[in-house]
Design a protein with these regions (language model features):
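Conserved hydrophobic/aromatic pocket- or pore-lining residues that grip, position, or stack substrates
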Residues: 23, 65, 83
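N-terminal pre-Walker A segment at the start of P-loop NTPase domains
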Residues: 18-42
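Pre-Walker A (Motif I) flank of P-loop NTPase domains
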Residues: 45-52
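Non-DNA-binding regulatory cores of transcription-related proteins
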Residues: 42-43, 141
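Walker A/P-loop
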Residues: 52-77
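Interdomain "pre-motor" coupling segment immediately N-terminal to P-loop NTPase/helicase cores
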Residues: 1-16
């Protein structure tokens, strides 16, 4: 179907061939099959819930997020895959072009936003502000998948602690799987 092909192309997946039917449930991966089957219903998207995948580099977070994203596209959901460093660069570029608010609104409209390489390094003030605005516009309305090498416990420090970190994490965690 042309529409689904376009949805998948427009999502800019790292791996557009990833498929939920091909998920490897090897016990070493510690994937909960029933939870993955629940995610495959796309109910989390309908409810505006987030997903957080945490694990070491190379363990399959990106592939898994892309499999869920491709599945969402097949169900006519709009999806965007982007790495956090790339997202921060885009925010800066749009700010310079005077199109920041327009870009933020567009990001707020995707049914599913997949943010890979989430918080690989500490953030600066501008990045934290951008992240807060993005989470505010999506919170409880649209779903976001976060792929990170660091567990949630380390995120607060990578966001420089304090009230902005609290606000960002509150919007992510309180509506997450």
């Amino acid at each position: 179907n042309h529409t689904i092909t376009k949805y998948i192309k427009d999502a800019h997946f790292y791996d557009s061939t990833a498929s939920i039917e091909d998920i490897n449930y090897n016990p070493d991966r510690k994937l909960n099959r029933s939870q993955m089957e629940e995610l495959a219903t796309n109910n989390y998207i309908e409810r505006g819930l987030n997903i957080i995948f945490v694990g070491a580099s190379g363990c399959g977070k990106t592939w898994l997020s892309n499999a869920l994203g491709v599945h969402a596209c097949r169900n006519r959901k709009t999806v965007l895959y982007i790495r956090l460093p790339e997202l921060f660069s885009k925010f800066e570029e749009k700010r310079i072009q005077g199109k920041y608010n327009e870009y933020l609104k567009r990001l707020g409209k995707y049914d599913l936003l997949i943010i890979d390489e989430f918080l690989l390094k500490p953030t600066n003030e501008s990045e934290r502000s951008d992240l807060l605005e993005l989470m505010e516009i999506r919170c409880n309305k649209k779903s976001t998948i976060f792929c990170s090498q660091y567990s949630f416990d380390g995120w607060h420090q990578l966001l420089d602690g304090g009230p902005i970190a609290d606000a960002i994490l509150d919007r992510i965690i309180n509506s997450s799987y």
